[in-house]
Structure formats: C-alpha cells, structure tokens
C-alpha cells in the first residue's frame, strides 16, 4: 500500500502531475458542461421561446449559440483539440451567464457560471497539457518539419 501511495505522490509531484491534472480537469469540466448542452438540445423547442437574450440576438439564436458552445467546444476541450480556441466561446458564454443574464449580479445566481469561467480561464492560460490531441499534433508537426 505504501509503495502505491509513494508512486502516486511521486507522479503527482512530478512535471507530469500538472499534465495529468489538466487532463482530468479537461475531461471533468467538459463532461459536466456537455450535460448542460445535451439538455438544451433535448429541450430546444421548449426553451427557445423563453431563453434569456441578454445581448439582443434573439432568444432562439442565443440558445443555438450557447448550445453549440456547450456541446461542440466541450467535446474539443475533452480531447484537447484547439483547446485554447475552444474555451473562448465558453468563456464568453459564462461571462454572459454570470454578469448579464440575471438582473442585479448576485453571487448565488452566478456561482456556477463563475466556477466554470475560472476553469476555462485556467485552461486558456495553461493550455491542454501533454495528454491532448494538441500536443500529439504538435509533436507530429515537429517530426515532419525536422525530417
């Protein structure tokens, strides 16, 4: 048991530990946001009429945009493909949800959106980590260029 704990501790404290943390963060936040997007797809017709339209694009179009971001961008985040670009629509969506959707900003109403926002900003700054399709593509391109 102590060898397993020691190995786990060494792995988490190594440089790979941060890459594993980014992988887990991407997978967990991606799946969680994906559930929001899938729920919007399943109830699109019912939501369309009363969906908040805080920036004046129309309720249906606002719903379509956030649904595409929550599903499409979350899938990209999960696999780590164009991760820094993929989190930008999610950051915008969470800013709109946190600061514009509900009148009179309150922490209670905005807490979940702010939590997602902080995670997406972290991924924007840190990138997807070593265990991502972005890294695989970078390594493949580097090999092709060097040959």
Question: What are these model-predicted stretches?
Answer:
Residues 1-42, 60-68, 72, 79-147:
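Extended, low-polarity transmembrane helix blocks
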Residues 47-60:
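Perimembrane loop-to-helix junctions flanking transmembrane segments
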